[in-house]
Amino acid sequence: MPQSAARGSAAWALVITGAASFMAALDNLVVTTALPSIREDLGGALEDLEWTVNAYTLTFAVLLMFGAALGDRFGRRRLFLTGLTIFTGASAAAALSPGIDALIAARAVQGVGAAIMMPLALTLLTAAVPAERRGAALGIFGAITGLAVASGPLVGGSLTEHFSWDWIFWLNVPIGLALLPLARLRLKESHGPGARLDVPGTVLISAGLFGIVYALVNANADGWTSATVLLGLFAGTALLVAFVFHGLRRPDAMLPMRLFASRAFTGINAASLLMFLGMFGSIFLLSQFLQGVLGYSPTEAGVRMLPWTAMPLLVSPIAGVVSDRIGGRPVVATGLALQAIGLGWFALVIEPGVAYSAQLPALIISGIGMGMYFAPAASLVMSSVRPAEQGIASGANNALREVGGALGVAILGAVFAAQGGYESGDAFVDGTVPALWIGSGAVALAALTALLIPGRRARGTAPAGEGAKEAKEYEPAAA
């Protein structure tokens, strides 16, 4: 292929995959600043609002690696188009939802589409870009995804205020319809290794996580000792235990448990899950606090959250450079500690009528902490496994982040419902403060977990005993 044609193909691949990933990443948090308007328009209790977030994150998380495997087997472009079609159609269905149950169902289908689309977008881009320009392309791709996450609350707030909440979903439809013919024409079909599809593993983890999250979300409404809640907790836990044994026995499992033999891999993934648990649950409540208690408009609420959500765009590149010099472990641990301090600061200062100036330090500290986490955490994940396993490791980490987010909304929502409610500003604060302390504690535990990640061995040294030869060829996770 001529050089100019190759450049054009790579540019088109970046535009198409970047736009698709922007939509999928945006929909993680775009709904948060629209929640008060959705509640006012469609009704629904706290648990219904939690499901508008969790229906997306759960299906996204549990099907992420399965979607990548489908693409490898049946064609990456073909499945990318399938995921994009599902996501676009579900976005239209969400916008047209006549009630809260229909919206939750549409959000779940959105998550299915995103889970197929997202991993294949990265694979298609990598294949389309020449090796000498791949780093720059992947950097732009990562920046686009980060911008989508950061701008989610602002975009959601602005569309809700100036149009209505359904426009946060209508936004995806013209973009998706434009991308479908472009992807068909401009992306090349490719296949991966013909690995077996782990359908049993996907069913086990999907049902297990659904049972636990369902129980947590409905515990306060139904009672912690109700049959449905107890069944959800026990059945969900049993299914997740079965998923672990399945991963131990099947070498081609969706999430091979052999990866967790690496203390570095286990540590960074545990820290990631806890970090997203605290962050997602806190954003879920604080975005409603800014509007429902302090009286900010949706746009004003989104703007006021930018010091937190947008700070990683500035801090992450610097954190990446620093981690290359001193190792990822201290940078990640420091970032998580700052995030925990920021959430604790929120818990100390929020009250009905609290000034924004009192909240601003917490927002900035949390944003800096989040930015210090992202780039070094990705590096720690990749360096904790062998090169041949990096694709699986990255997918597992992304899935566990989404699981953490879903659990965070469920757990912090349960604490909020037990201690407060929507009856008044005081009631909302009564529920939010203990929930924020739980979120802060989860992120603090993540910081301690990050400190336990093993340090880097001196280059060329190997552990004694079996596998020493292999260790010489592979350097474990950075300090």
Where does each model-flagged region fall?
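Transmembrane-helix bundle of Major Facilitator Superfamily
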Residues: 1-185, 308, 314-319, 323-351, ...
